[in-house]
A protein has these predicted regions:
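Cofactor-/ligand-binding subdomain signature composed of acidic, glycine-rich
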Residues: 1-34
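A short, mixed-charge helix-start or loop-turn motif at secondary-structure junctions
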Residues: 13, 37, 108-109
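Asp/Glu-centered strand-loop micro-motifs enriched in Gly/Pro and often flanked by an aromatic residue
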Residues: 33-42
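Cofactor-binding active-site loop characterized by glycine-rich and histidine/acidic residues
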Residues: 41-164
């Protein structure tokens, strides 16, 4: 299995398109395995597998920052950042992995612990402002679903991001 060997998104960089598809298939199976035994959010995670593989292939995490809204779609991200055992292993392995993004679990890859909708864009603008103050150039990627995009805080974040004008 590819996903058992992936310790960081950098491990995806040398894979062919066919191999990336296999990684996506294995990630989907791992998400289903965890959710069937442990519970969790199946739909948003399954719907975001290919996008997560693509994001981690294109961007350079952990230098580039991913900010998940609600974290209902973060399981594929966890699989691709060295935490596949929490989706493939025994129940004790699954219990060690949070159902949400968790800096306590992975400070390198999980920037915030969230559980409320519509927050990712605002949080990303905070990272954007910090990046600009430091004078660094990493990408900040806000990941938000259609249900969360209708929240007031998402609109506030979009407004602030446009005011800052330096890109998220």
């Amino acid at each position: 299995m590819y996903i058992e060997k992936i310790q960081s998104p950098a491990d995806l960089k040398g894979l062919s398109l066919a191999e990336l598809k296999t990684v996506a298939d294995e990630t989907r199976a791992a998400v289903l395995n965890r959710v069937s035994k442990h519970g969790g959010h199946v739909g948003p995670n399954l719907g975001f597998v290919e996008a997560t593989v693509a994001l981690h292939y294109v961007f350079d995490a952990p230098k580039d920052k991913f900010v998940f809204d609600v974290s209902h779609q973060c399981y594929p991200h966890k699989v691709l950042t060295g935490r596949a055992s929490g989706f493939l292993g025994e129940m004790s392995d699954m219990n060690a992995i949070s159902g949400y993004s968790s800096p306590a679990e992975s400070p390198e890859y999980d920037n915030f612990e969230v559980g409320h909708t519509s927050t990712s864009i605002s949080l990303a603008t905070g990272l954007q402002k910090a990046r600009d103050i430091k004078g660094t150039h990493e990408n900040i990627i806000a990941i938000i679903g259609d249900g969360s995009l209708s929240g007031g805080e998402a609109f506030e974040g979009l407004d602030e991001a446009s005011e800052l004008g330096t890109g998220i």
